[in-house]
Amino acid sequence: LGLLVIDEVFDGWREKKTDYDYRQLFDKWRFYDLDMMLRRDRNHPSVFCWSIGNEILERKSEQAVQWAREMRDYIRTIDRTRPVTQALASWDNDWEIYDPLASQHDIVGYNYLIQKAESDHQRVSWRVMMQTESFPRDVWRNHKAVEEHPYVVGDFVWTGIDYLGESGIGL
C-alpha cells in the first residue's frame, strides 16, 4: 500500500469555525507550529505536499493573501522540494476573487470544485490544480479530469467511509 500525504498544518486561521479552534493562537503560534510540523515530517517519504489551510473563512481578504505568502515563504526556507497548497472552497458566484490567494500556492487545492478547472485554466493558464476533497460518488468524473487535463494533478476523496464527524458524507 502506498499513501500520498498532504501534510496540513491549520484547519482555520483567524476567523471562527468552532468555539475552541486555532484562531486564538494563530497570530502568536502559527510560525512555531508550522516549523514543528515541517521539521517533524520533512523526512517522511509519503509527504508530497505541505498545506497551510483548509477552507479558511477569511479567504477573500488581502490579509489572507499576505499570511499565505508569509507561510509559503517560510516553508521554502525549510523545504524547497515539496509544493505548497491550501484547500479552497467556495459556494460564491465570484470564484475569481480567490485568484490572489490561489497565486500564493504551487498547487491550488479545490474542495468539491474541480468542475471549475477548465474555465480557471483558460483564465489562469499557469495554475496547477488538484481536488483536495471530493465525494466518493464523483471518483470516476474526477479521475477523467486528471487524465484529460495535465494541469489537474490529482483527486483526494473525503471520505470513503462514514464517521461521526460528518456522517453521511461518504455516500
Put a short name on every predicted segment.
Residues 1-118, 123-126, 133-136, 140:
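Active-site mouth of glycoside hydrolases
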